[in-house]
Amino acid sequence: MSASSLLEQRPKGQGNKVQNGSVHQKDGLNDDDFEPYLSPQARPNNAYTAMSDSYLPSYYSPSIGFSYSLGEAAWSTGGDTAMPYLTSYGQLSNGEPHFLPDAMFGQPGALGSTPFLGQHGFNFFPSGIDFSAWGNNSSQGQSTQSSGYSSNYAYAPSSLGGAMIDGQSAFASETLNKAPGMNTIDQGMAALKLGSTEVASNVPKVVGSAVGSGSITSNIVASNSLPPATIAPPKPASWADIASKPAKQQPKLKTKNGIAGSSLPPPPIKHNMDIGTWDNKGPVAKAPSQALVQNIGQQPTQGSPQPVGQQANNSPPVAQASVGQQTQPLPPPPPQPAQLSVQQQAAQPTRWVAPRNRGSGFGHNGVDGNGVGQTQAGSGSTPSEPHPVLEKLRSINNYNPKDFDWNLKHGRVFIIKSYSEDDIHRSIKYNIWCSTEHGNKRLDAAYRSMNGKGPVYLLFSVNGSGHFCGVAEMKSAVDYNTCAGVWSQDKWKGRFDVRWIFVKDVPNSQLRHIRLENNENKPVTNSRDTQEVPLEKAKQVLKIIASYKHTTSIFDDFSHYEKRQEEEESVKKERQGRGK
């Protein structure tokens, strides 16, 4: 038998497999007998209950717990909507408040069949079948609102039952109001606006209402149950209105003397560090003239200038207070030209000034014939008592000789830049000096090259002082294995003997015109340490220094530097005692 004949005969054999019965089934059976077997065919391939069908009471909580008419809420967080709070099915019971969105159980017959036992249909999509997925929904018969805080919230019903109220209803005929604290976000946003205090005070405090929201506020006013409240429009507060308001008067600050106001602004801060430090280039105010002091003397309070003699006692000298710090009562009179000139002088950055020149202008202190200066003290013009060490030095050495031979035939001259006047004072006191390692080699080579054929002169100047303070002659070669131990800094090694010839302050203005061809044609006043001066130019410098009628010198502050040396030595002894 062929395969084709088998295929043709197989359906016939299957169709005839009916035993003990008629070939036509309807002859012996009723239609109702097959109804229980045909009913499952209505839902083929469905192993779960359809969402639109009513649920079984044996699976869910008792049906009495859902006797409310529920509204709607979105399930997505897209757009301006907020995610509702969902509870589990097992916690639902009768009379308990629960924040279940009305989208869980919608209106009857939305997508499903008739509600089971009077309950609502099981509907996950709010607003029926016209719901636009994941968008801003709008129920039938409701207007769409643009506000983000509109009808997207469902609020807890009371324990007495009743419909849940959406976030859009506003006192129409409901007995229940919105949930407390609903619009805290709206109130917080309204508080950020300009003039928010006025808006918050004018809008009536209604539970569940928004403050500062235009759409919700209009709904509240247009409500039927609430009488129309007269809400004053918020007062406009523009930038022009704010700018037109007068500025608040600032309280006048009082000075230390207790007098408000000042005729002149305060001068720049002056930081005066230790006396004689090479890098102390802070501005120093000069003392006001006598006429200006008399004019300011009419003020209620005036700080008397500290005498120079008192400045040189225990502490480093401090510059006197400038005229700009003096205060005057209100209204302040216009500043006088003399005051402006003194203030401009104080504001300009000046060089480091020696203590002897800080009480008055440079070059105004009286000096006797031997170069011993007189300090101008506030108590009187009597000269200060000379120090015993200075008297001994003056008796041994003939400082500032009048018969000095500046016209050298042989010799070498070098510029010496000192870091402080303390080292100048000790060089004069001990007749020694020490330069840097490079400077010591240069000076030692120059001294040995002369071999007694001519002098080696050293022109001393303190960094930032603005003047040359004296001339000394090198009297020995450099001893590299000796440390003097008397300098203000302990880093100097080596020493050589010197003899001081001139001890006087010669301003740089007297020597600035002399330029050195071996230093890029710079002025002699703009030289580095151990800069050699050509012999012809050195003669000019020595002639000017020898003939200059000085008014100040380091001798004026000799007592001050003596006391500073004693203090430094006591500090060194204390450190050595601690080290042991």
UniProtKB/Swiss-Prot annotation:
Ubiquitinated by the SCF(SKP2) complex, leading to its degradation. Residues 411-545 form the YTH domain. Residues 386-580 are annotated as: Interaction with m6A-containing mRNAs. Its main location: cytoplasm. Residues 1-45, 247-388 are annotated as: Disordered. Pfam families: YTH. One of its GO terms (biological process) is regulation of cell adhesion. The modification Phosphoserine is found at S2, S4, S5, S22, S39, S196, S360, S395. It comes from the Eukaryota. Keywords: Acetylation, Cell cycle, Cell division, Cytoplasm, Differentiation, Immunity, Innate immunity, Mitosis, Nucleus, Oogenesis, Phosphoprotein, RNA-binding, Spermatogenesis, Ubl conjugation. GO terms for cellular component: centriolar satellite; cytoplasm; cytoplasmic stress granule; cytosol; nucleus; P-body. It is found in: Cytoplasm, Cytosol; Cytoplasm, P-body; Cytoplasm, Stress granule; Nucleus. RNA binds at K417, S418, Y419, D423, W433, C434, N463, W487, W492. GO terms for molecular function: C5-methylcytidine-containing RNA reader activity; mRNA binding; N6-methyladenosine-containing RNA reader activity. Belongs to the YTHDF family. YTHDF2 subfamily. Interacts with CNOT1; interaction is direct and promotes recruitment of the CCR4-NOT complex. Interacts with YTHDF3. Interacts with RIDA/HRSP12; interaction leads to recruitment of the ribonuclease P/MRP complex. The disordered regions have the ability to interact with each other and to 'phase separate' into liquid droplets within the cytosol following binding to mRNAs containing multiple m6A-modified residues. This leads to the partition of m6A-containing mRNAs into membraneless compartments, where mRNAs may be stored, degraded or used to transport mRNAs to dendritic arbors in neurons. This is YTH domain-containing family protein 2. The gene is YTHDF2.
